Design a protein with these regions (language model features):
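Alpha/beta catalytic cores of group-transfer enzymes, especially the acyltransferase/condensing modules
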Residues: 10-12, 37-41, 100-254
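Polyanion-binding loop/helix "lid" in catalytic or ligand-binding cores
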Residues: 258-261
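Small/polar (Gly/Ser/Thr/Ala-rich) solvent-exposed segments
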Residues: 264
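Short secondary-structure transition/capping segments
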Residues: 203-206, 286, 308
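Glycine-rich, flexible loop segments associated with nucleotide phosphate handling
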Residues: 154-156, 271-274
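FabD-like malonyl-/acyl-CoA
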Residues: 1-142, 194, 272-306
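Long, low-complexity C-terminal extensions of enzymes
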Residues: 267-269
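Short amphipathic alpha-helix with an adjacent loop that forms part of the alpha/beta core around
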Residues: 148, 306-310
Length: 310
């Protein structure tokens, strides 16, 4: 049986993350130590002991999520069998490139730390907002965004196309608020404002792109052992030379998660799916996108023990 790997993005960070993994699996501890060395700081201590307010800052949360994912990857890598593709949600795409063998984990940690810093700076220069729209189709959400942008003379876009009935919108605060109102008028069940430090995956992140391109250009990407599905295009990226372009484009482009999952399911209809990292959010989304898919979330020591014993 072939395997598809999924890697989560920001939002699943919490104090105590990876502590059970490090205590149970030497490979996980070694991975965390290598990332601490690369960042020249004890990210591990912040993940284990907090404070939560500091861990939640985007330039800490992003490398923390990546560290968790690649620590799990280090534990399961020799037990995965035939991995045919990987995808990661937003910053999770960096973890996917690590899994492919094209990017070393310490280099990936430095990249996402820089990515978080640049995104924070862009958010401070032009404050933005994001909101999750539940229970409304993507086309209706996109229509509400277009109308909301016109009415407020601002920017708001569908930023994360997470499932057929869950879309995150992003942009100027007034425009996001108005688009959310229009979504509710169109029948959305709920519109939930998100706690974020900027309008991620929208044109408001444009000031961060050049700095990220510079960091990506200074990073070596090798040839991947299997393709990575890019958020920005939902296409299969099969060479390391393309990685920098798709990762830079991701900052201002929507996360095309629904299309990505459908493309993977079409190419690999009999695959087993594994989500490596904290939270298990992608496992839930996959069931709404590809109901027949079987996905196992592996983020804790107990989950790994159960999976390895099966």
């Amino acid at each position: 049986m072939v395997t598809v790997l999924l890697f989560p993005g920001q939002g699943a960070q919490k104090v105590g993350m990876t502590k059970d993994l490090a205590a149970r699996f030497p490979e996980a501890l070694a991975t965390l130590e290598s990332i601490d060395a690369a960042l020249q700081t004890s990210l591990t201590q912040l993940m284990w002991d907090g404070p939560e307010a500091e861990l939640t800052l985007t330039h800490n949360a992003q490398p923390a999520i990546l560290a968790h994912s690649v620590a799990v990857l280090a534990v399961v890598r020799d037990r995965l069998g035939d991995v045919v593709a990987a995808a990661g949600h937003s910053l999770g795409e960096y973890s996917a490139w690590v899994a492919s063998g094209a990017l070393e984990a310490p280099a990936a940690a430095r990249l996402v730390r820089r990515r978080g810093e640049l995104m924070l700076e862009a958010g401070e220069a032009r404050p933005g907002a994001m909101a999750a729209v539940l229970g409304l189709g993507t086309a209706e959400v996109e229509l509400a965004c277009a109308q909301g942008a016109i009415e407020t003379h601002g920017t708001v876009v569908a930023a994360n196309l997470n499932s057929p009935d869950q879309t995150v919108i992003s942009g100027d605060p007034d425009s996001v608020r108005r688009a959310g109102e229009l979504c509710q008028a169109a029948g959305a069940k709920r519109v939930l404002p998100l706690k974020v430090s900027g309008a991620f995956h929208s044109p408001l992140m444009e000031p961060a792109v050049s700095g990220l391109r510079e960091a990506l250009g200074a990073t070596r990407f090798g040839h991947p052992a299997f393709p990575v599905v890019a958020n920005a295009t939902a296409g299969f990226v099969e060479t390391g030379t393309e990685a920098a372009d798709v990762l830079a484009a991701q900052l201002t482009s929507p996360v095309r998660w629904v299309d990505s999952m459908r493309r993977l399911a079409e190419r690999y209809p009999d695959a087993q799916w594994l989500e490596l990292g904290p939270g298990g959010v992608l496992t839930g989304l996959l069931k709404r996108i590809v109901p027949d898919a079987t996905c196992v979330a592996l983020g804790t020591a107990s989950q790994l023990d159960a999976w390895m014993a099966a």
